UniProtKB/Swiss-Prot annotation:
Domain of life assignment: Bacteria
One Pfam family this sequence matches: Pyr_redox_2
The protein's name: Putative oxidoreductase YgfK
Cofactor stoichiometry and binding remark: Binds 1 [4Fe-4S] cluster.
Length: 1032
């Protein structure tokens, strides 16, 4: 029910593992081809125990359930740090408890199970791993993995009988009846010849049947001590002594990043761009100090040596922070992940210098594929992870980390290389990965509700104004099918040369790779398709045959929207004429956008190809052209694409006349007019046009300085981030929270200093005047605000306007006048080029539908996608990226990075530590795979909701498989519960009881349940292991 996890009985666990393996060649969603096989001959030793890999899951969400531990092992984790236990084992935690959007915050502590249940989960996993290892990776040298116990939080609690029983049973379970029970269960399974034959294990029969007797009764020889933030030094030392002296356990003690002191921690976070993370200085006052730690560690190392045991430190604990995000409950939350790395690695350097590299370090602070090689090469081991495994790719990131380590020459190091660690600690403060800007702030999202079925979607496509087939054309490029890729692009994009240069690429802000490393350079790939595919595409292209039955179309305006409309309609056989008042086509792209942003020949390329489709151009047309005139000339459809060619300007006091409006200025600049602007130019506004004006002004002879003045802050600035960065690169200066009031003849520009108030209707904080002013000495002023339609001209043209003076149009851009459409910026104000093309597509789609032309998009099926191939990419992070200058290497790299999310998404499956979301192939749906939620496995941590691109929560909104009647009754999720020959079903808060036969077939299914019952039948027939028993 909800956040109550239900453990899987051991026998059922084995059934789940091997039935899924037989059915799907996967275990807990990990495909067989991605089971990690350690490199032979490379091992590490941790206090005398051998480990085939130095990596594994940290004590946390990935080691709470048996299936989590199994999944960690399958993907390369061999040092398994079990989730922390404590005497208070019946705490109720508020949910959600994890926020892993970037750096991770959590509000969870120890295991959510009782001590007995936690021990039982670890025991199940202990047996399961021995079996899996014997089946898939047999070895004569014994087990390849280490279980490490994690306990907390004070000595009094640890000495309580339940904790003593837990620790003792972890150290030796020989007298516990569960150990004998599970050994008998395993023995029975391995004596079953049918089981061995089904999985091709007959040749291993002898060794497998001897396995149960060989499984050690001691699960752990080591412990990691976890103490609360603020635990007194004497208490920490006392617990360590107890573990060494009384329990005889090799011991790691977990220390806090607060050892660096408040000032240093604050400095590091601020330098790396994480200044918004709130800290309480008094928390540092209560924590262990460095001098105290050094003295304590020296005493404990001596004690361990005396007892012939191992002792070291676990670095580091999470960092206690103020809960100022509002995503999690409570006043405090605990930070981990990449923001923790520079802190933890600097703690490691401080301690290693003090102990000359002889202090063993178990590491966990911000380890990832981008840092693990550097950490390992210093001699630090083992290395455990939690935050990185909560990101898309999930457990597969462990495998990726191991592949990074396979080539290391540091496997034989038996101490910490202090010099190397010092260099890493210094580098950690400046490396890209630890800087906040490394991950853009944009959230990958689809602005629609999460559907019950068919939820696989490529967010790059949904973000695109023309819904370009991005994953498909990237795959074609990767296969060197450049002309095919370009043909696919042309299906939806009339202007690939233009949009290959100046598209606002919303696709890249919604690329799933942002949750891994960086977005694909999609716009550059479009450019490559045109460069490499054009010649072949043009050879096989045929001019569309015009049809005498098609109605003629007039388009007023030959800018991007007009060109696109002409292309789409002419391609479908319509006679199209574009009427343009200028002497050329291209509109704002040709005449306003500076040519340093896009070469003129590329603009002409798109114009020429539109003309090649038979589109006619009439230049120098009267601005007084009306809809009625065009209708009288025989045009059935009229599309208006006149753009936004008016500037409202800025009202200023003063008598300086050296004031330009942005559009006239850029038009004159593009003509090559000899402009006299003086030395210092100020541009008012902070949109893309303002960036163009400032960059253009700097290229005018005599101009030495260009300053953009904006009345809001950087965060509210409407310009695309890319345009802002280009302006900075060119040397443009910025003055935020300044608003011009007066421009005097002597060049004095008076600016009112502003502050930010409450958000406006667009979510931007309103600028509020202060009593302060500043002055600048300025030669010319350019106003780049208030671009809008010429509503007077529209009214004269005969366009109906609404009460606010905007064109009154429907979703397709059609006005109240039948067959008259508004497209491009004139429809709703200035936007991007691709958005203008998008409005043209919607209008032309409506026209073609009205003309009974089914579609102007080819139905050719471009990709026979192999999901296994895509899944291979899921755990990988690109350590280095090649430059786009090397076209072949760049295309190969980006094609390999594309996750093709509309074919294989399953992010909610990846990121769930408990494996509570599953993807199964179900025939008869649009998507090959459907996502189900397993109620029994879920604790509602909220992580799947964080990374799902839809507006929704998979653990609440997807079809839920219930295992217990009480959980079904206490939930509102859509889902089902199979009870022998009947199924209880819930959808939209309505419930049904249906009969199901032994073959999984229903009778009399209500129409609204067709999809759900098809899935239920498929699960019943092919994935019955998902319906297995659970413990109450």
């Amino acid at each position: 029910m909800g956040d109550i996890m239900r453990p899987i009985p051991f026998e059922e666990l084995l059934t789940r593992i091997f039935d899924e393996y037989q059915q799907q060649r996967s275990i807990f969603g990990i495909p067989e081809q991605q089971f990690y096989s350690p490199v032979k001959g490379k091992t590490v030793s941790v206090f005398g125990e051998t480990c085939a890999t130095p990596v594994g899951p940290a004590a946390g969400p990935h080691t709470q359930l048996a299936q989590n531990i199994v999944t960690s092992w399958l993907t390369g984790g061999r040092f398994i740090e079990l989730k922390t236990v404590q005497i208070l084992d019946r705490l109720e935690l508020e949910k959600p408890c994890i926020d892993a959007e970037d750096e991770c915050f959590n509000t969870e502590w120890s295991t959510e199970f009782t001590l007995l249940k936690a021990w039982d989960e670890y025991l199940k996993a202990w047996f399961a791993l021995h079996l899996l290892e014997a089946m898939f990776q047999p070895s004569d040298s014994g087990k390849s993995f280490i279980f490490n116990m994690s306990v907390g939080y004070n000595l009094e609690g640890i000495k309580q009988p339940p904790m003593q029983q837990f620790i003792d049973n972890m150290m030796d379970a020989s007298d516990h009846p569960k150990f004998a029970q599970y050994r008998d269960t395993l023995n029975k399974l391995l004596q079953d010849d049918a089981f061995l034959a089904r999985h091709g294990l007959q040749e291993k029969r002898e060794s497998l049947q001897a396995l149960p007797a060989r499984i050690p009764t001691s699960m752990v020889h080591g412990v990691t001590l976890s103490t609360m933030h603020g635990c007194p030094p004497h208490e920490i030392e006392a617990i360590c002594r107890y573990m060494l002296e009384e329990k005889g356990l090799n011991t790691f003690v977990k220390l806090n990043p607060t050892l660096l002191g408040y000032a240093r921690v604050r400095e590091i976070l601020d330098v790396c761009g994480f200044g918004y993370i709130g800290l309480k200085e008094e928390s540092f006052d209560h924590d262990l100090k460095l001098t105290q730690a050094l003295e304590m560690l020296e005493r404990l190392m001596a004690l361990a040596k005396e007892k012939s045991l191992g002792f070291g430190v676990k670095l580091t604990n999470t960092l206690g922070t103020i809960n100022n995000k509002g995503a999690l409950p409570g006043e405090e939350m605990y930070m981990s992940g990449r923001a923790l790395f520079p802190l933890s690695i600097n703690v490691a350097a401080v301690l290693s210098r003090a102990f000359d590299g002889k202090l063993p370090i178990s590491y966990s602070g911000g380890a990832s594929q981008l840092t693990i090689r550097d950490i390992f090469d210093t001699g630090i081991r083992p290395i455990t992870m939690a935050t990185d495994l909560l990101k898309p790719g999930g457990y597969l990131r462990l495998s990726a980390c191991m592949r990074e380590l396979e080539g290391s020459d540091a496997w034989g190091l038996d101490h910490v290389d202090v010099e190397r660690l010092n260099r890493l600690a210094a580098d950690a403060l400046t490396m890209e990965y630890t800087q906040k800007h490394w991950k853009p702030e944009e959230r990958i999202e689809v602005a629609e509700d999460l559907p019950l079925t068919d939820c696989y979607v490529a967010p790059c496509v949904t973000a695109c104004a023309i819904k370009q087939d991005i994953p498909e054309y990237i795959r074609l490029l990767g296969e060197h099918r450049y002309a095919d890729a370009l043909e696919l692009i042309y299906q939806r994009n009339a202007l690939p040369a233009i949009t290959g240069h100046i598209c606002d690429h919303q696709c890249q802000y919604n690329c799933t790779r942002l949750d891994y490393d960086s977005a694909l350079n999609i716009r550059e790939l479009k450019k490559v398709a045109l460069e490499k595919g054009w010649d072949e595409y043009k050879q096989r292209w045929h001019k569309p045959a015009g049809s005498g039955s098609r109605h003629p179309v007039a388009v007023i305006g030959a800018g991007p929207a007009g060109l696109a409309a002409g292309y789409f309609l002419a391609r479908a056989g319509h006679p199209v004429t574009l009427f343009e008042r200028e002497a050329n086509a291209g509109g704002v792209v040709k005449n306003i956008i500076p040519q340093f942003r896009i070469p003129a020949e590329l603009i002409q390329h798109d114009i020429d190809f539109v003309a090649a489709h038979g589109v006619k151009f009439e230049y120098g047309c009267s601005p007084d052209l009306t809809i009625e005139q065009l209708k009288n000339q025989g045009f059935h459809y009229v599309l208006i694409a006149t753009g936004t060619d008016k500037n409202s300007g800025v009202k200023l006091a003063g008598d300086n006349q050296n004031v330009w409006k942005s559009l006239p200025f850029l038009r004159e600049y593009n003509k090559g007019t000899a402009l006299k602007l003086g030395k210092h130019v100020v541009v008012v506004g902070a949109g893309n046009t303002a960036m163009d004006c400032a960059r253009a002004a700097l290229r005018v002879p005599g101009v030495e300085k260009a300053t953009i003045v904006y009345r809001r802050s950087l965060q509210e600035m409407p310009a695309w981030r890319e345009e802002y960065e280009e302006a900075l690169h060119d040397g443009v200066e910025f003055r935020f929270l300044n608003n011009p009031e007066r421009f005097d003849a002597d060049g004095t520009l008076t600016l009112r200093v502003m502050s930010l108030g409450e958000p406006d209707e667009k979510g931007r904080r309103r600028p509020v005047e202060t009593n302060e002013t500043v002055t600048l000495l300025v030669d010319s002023l350019i106003t780049a605000i208030g671009e809008q339609q010429d509503t007077e001209a529209l009214n004269a043209m005969g366009v109906p306007l609404d009460k606010n003076g905007w064109p009154d149009v429907d979703h397709n851009g059609e006005t109240r006048l039948t067959d008259v459409f508004m497209i491009g910026d004139v429809q709703r104000g200035p936007s991007s080029i691709v958005a203008a093309v998008g409005t043209a597509r919607r209008a032309t789609d409506a026209i073609l539908s009205r003309e009974n032309i089914r579609s102007h998009q080819n139905d050719k099926y471009w990709n026979n996608v192999n999901p296994a191939e895509i899944y291979q990419r899921k755990g990988d992070i690109s350590i280095t990226l090649v430059n786009s200058d090397d076209r072949d290497a760049f295309v190969a790299q980006e094609a390999a990075r594309c996750l093709e999310c509309n074919y294989v998404c399953s992010k909610c499956v990846d990121v769930c530590p408990n494996r509570a979301n599953v993807s199964i192939a179900v025939p008869g749906f649009q998507n090959r795979f459907q996502t189900l939620h397993l109620d029994a496995y879920c604790n509602e941590c909220g992580n799947c909701a964080q990374f799902c691109p839809w507006n929704g929560k998979p653990y609440k909104d997807k079809i839920t498989v219930f295992s217990l009647a009480q959980d079904f009754d206490n939930s509102s999720n859509p889902g089902f519960l199979v009870e022998d020959c009947r199924v209880r079903v819930r959808l939209n808060n309505q419930s049904w009881v249906l009969n199901i036969d032994s073959k999984g077939q229903f009778n009399n299914v209500p129409p609204e349940l067709n999809d759900m019952c098809r899935i239920i039948s498929h699960v019943h027939q092919h994935h019955h292991y998902l319906l297995g028993r659970v413990e109450v």
